[in-house]
A protein has these predicted regions:
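Short beta-alpha junctions and helix-cap segments that line functional grooves
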Residues: 20, 108-111, 133-134
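Catalytic core of bacterial c-di-GMP phosphodiesterases, primarily the EAL and HD-GYP domains
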Residues: 1-8, 13, 32-107, 183
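Surface-exposed amphipathic alpha-helices with a cationic face
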Residues: 48-52, 83, 109-119, 166-173, ...
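Conserved, function-defining core regions and hallmark residues within catalytic/recognition domains
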Residues: 23
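A conserved signal-transducing helical linker
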Residues: 27-31
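EAL-family c-di-GMP phosphodiesterase catalytic domain
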Residues: 9-13, 65-72, 92-104, 120-256
Length: 256
């Protein structure tokens, strides 16, 4: 199964790209993050439908902010949209930061359950430690956990449980959760992960992030007689921008 991760980007009045880490906190303070999440969800569904015309075995990871879960009005809009597109639930994975997922209040937990009841699955990213309770996560609908490869391989990582990082994939698998090693940027990392039984990887090594075409835009033109492709700027999205952040590679090594 090929999957894409969407990352939102904004443009300022000088047409400069603003990364999520630079605007999310401001958007949350201004009460705009829910609107951004809603727009990104719509874009994810548009692209997912486009991809599924050619390949049904495809999936998309879509980030959702904790503030969106906490705001009943904003969440209601998102839920209505996801309800209308619940046929895509098996292919649309909603992603939350580890720190946010650990600190969900009553309202957020109820909203999360509403999404799970409609068939949506969840992913955890921005993992900073391996204090993971697979049973609890599985009960809440988590089916993927993205752990930085460096964290898995760090010999100085303090033991957070009785299980070694090399056994984490097997432990999660018992509860129906797939471990994804992310931020893989070199072949050496792939080799080092072979003993960890990691079935999925994400990172620049597999595919760098790239902008998506606006909905309805024609595909990029073929190279001309001189072998030159059209300028990349012709393929850029208007704000907010979503980028595919490395297709997940099935099996880090082994026969294809």
């Amino acid at each position: 199964m090929a999957t894409l991760r969407f990352v939102e980007r904004l443009r300022d009045d000088k047409d400069q790209i603003i990364a999520a880490e630079d605007f999310v906190a401001i958007a949350e303070t201004a009460g705009l993050i829910g609107r951004i999440d809603h727009m990104v969800m719509m874009r994810c569904v548009q692209v997912l439908r486009r991809l599924m015309v050619r390949n049904k075995d495809v999936g998309v990871f879509c980030n959702v902010a904790a503030a969106t879960l906490a705001n009943s009005s904003t969440f209601s809009q998102c839920l209505d949209f996801l309800e209308a597109n619940r046929a895509l639930a098996p292919s649309l994975v909603l992603e939350f930061k580890q720190a946010n997922f650990r600190n969900l209040g009553t309202t957020e937990s109820e909203h999360l359950a509403a999404l799970s009841q409609r068939g949506y699955r969840f992913s955890i990213d921005h993992v900073s430690d391996l204090r993971i309770d697979p049973r609890e996560l599985a009960d809440r609908g988590v089916r993927f956990i993205k752990v930085p490869a460096a964290l898995l391989l760090d010999p100085k990582q303090p033991p957070a449980s009785d299980i070694h990082p090399s056994d984490l994939s097997d432990l999660l698998g018992r509860f129906g959760i797939d471990l994804i090693a992310e931020r893989i940027e070199g072949e050496r990392t792939v080799v080092d992960l072979l003993d960890y039984d990691v079935r999925f990887g994400q990172g620049f090594l597999f595919a760098p992030p790239r902008p998506l075409r606006p909905e309805g835009a024609p595909p990029p033109a073929a190279p001309d007689a001189n072998g030159k492709a059209p300028p990349a700027e012709e393929q850029l999205d208007p704000p907010p921008r979503a980028t595919g952040n490395a297709a997940l590679a099935r099996r880090l090594a082994g026969p294809t």
